[in-house]
Regions:
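Glycine/small-residue-rich loop that forms an oxyanion/phosphate-binding "nest" at active or ligand-binding sites
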Residues: 53, 61-118
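Conserved anion-binding
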Residues: 11-12, 19-23, 90-93, 97-171
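Glycine-rich phosphate-binding active-site loops on the catalytic face of alpha/beta enzymes
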Residues: 83, 94-112, 167-170, 198-202, ...
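Charged helix-capping and loop-helix junction motifs
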Residues: 60-67, 141-150, 175-184
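Catalytic cores of alpha/beta
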Residues: 72-73, 77-98, 180-216
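Glycine-rich, proline-tolerant flexible connector loops at the mouths of alpha/beta enzymes
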Residues: 46-64, 104, 165-175
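Conserved, mostly hydrophobic/aromatic
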Residues: 8, 39, 47, 92, ...
Length: 239
């Protein structure tokens, strides 16, 4: 299983939100590159970066930080947050970003998403955020009428090979992740590499996710609070 420690950026700082709420933000550092180096030292080979400003208002205010992370290298780098145009995808890929994550635009413009999946293949992942089982968009403020599992099936049919699935209720809450959900996704949407995201806070959960065939897991607040030790997690489950 791949482990993606997460760096969420707001105003160039390393932060975490609780359940996607911008008013419940904790700053964990001022230097994203230094944080990434710490992850490398712990054995990480992958990095999940979210531009929270981009996700909220489409700006590129964290572009410099992301460019510096890409230039620093040493990690497979996936980036999400505010990627809604092919121009933005190209901008990131040309920096050296390995994979771009499409979020809300996958719901609001499925045709565009299908075209990007066809054009860029495995260099595109889709982030699916679900609230009570239904797809949520725009920083989790809007909830659609489509079930997350059904949306994942549509994405798979459009050629999507990687989906980062977040159960919003779990995210940043440090109460554990929704293991039953990832078991269901693996069974009902075969052929897609799912990344578990949100609430993972124990080694037992990581081992269970690996056992059920989950492709990857994102670790956020659990690392920053010290609930999980990245070096130990890498030794336990990383390919």
């Amino acid at each position: 299983m791949q482990l993606f420690p997460a760096i969420d950026l707001r105003g160039g700082k390393v932060v975490r939100l609780t359940q996607g709420d911008y008013d419940r933000m904790t700053v964990y550092g001022e230097a994203p590159c230094a944080q990434a180096r710490q992850f490398v030292e712990a054995g990480a080979r992958y990095l999940h970066v979210v531009d929270l400003d981009g996700a909220k208002d489409g700006t590129l205010s964290n572009y410099g930080s992301i460019a510096a992370l890409a230039e620093q290298g040493g990690l497979y780098l996936e980036v999400g947050g505010g990627i809604r145009t092919e121009e933005r995808i190209e901008k990131y890929l040309s920096l050296g970003v390995d994979r771009c994550i499409l979020g809300s635009v996958a719901v609001t413009d499925f045709d565009f998403t299908a075209r990007m999946l066809k054009r860029y293949g495995e260099r595109i992942a889709v982030g699916v955020d679900a609230k009570d089982g239904f797809v949520a968009t725009h920083g989790w403020k809007e909830v659609s009428a489509e079930k997350g599992v059904d949306f994942c099936r549509r994405l798979a049919d459009a050629g999507c090979v990687a989906i980062i699935y977040t159960d919003i209720a779990c995210d940043g809450a440090m109460q554990g992740t929704n293991l039953a959900l990832y078991r269901q996704l693996a069974a009902e949407v075969p052929g897609v590499a799912f990344t578990a995201s949100g609430g993972i806070s124990s080694e037992a959960e990581l081992l269970e996710l690996k056992k059920m065939g989950t492709a990857a897991a994102i670790l956020g607040k659990s690392l920053y609070t010290g609930a999980l030790d990245l070096k130990r997690c890498v030794e336990l489950v990383q390919n």
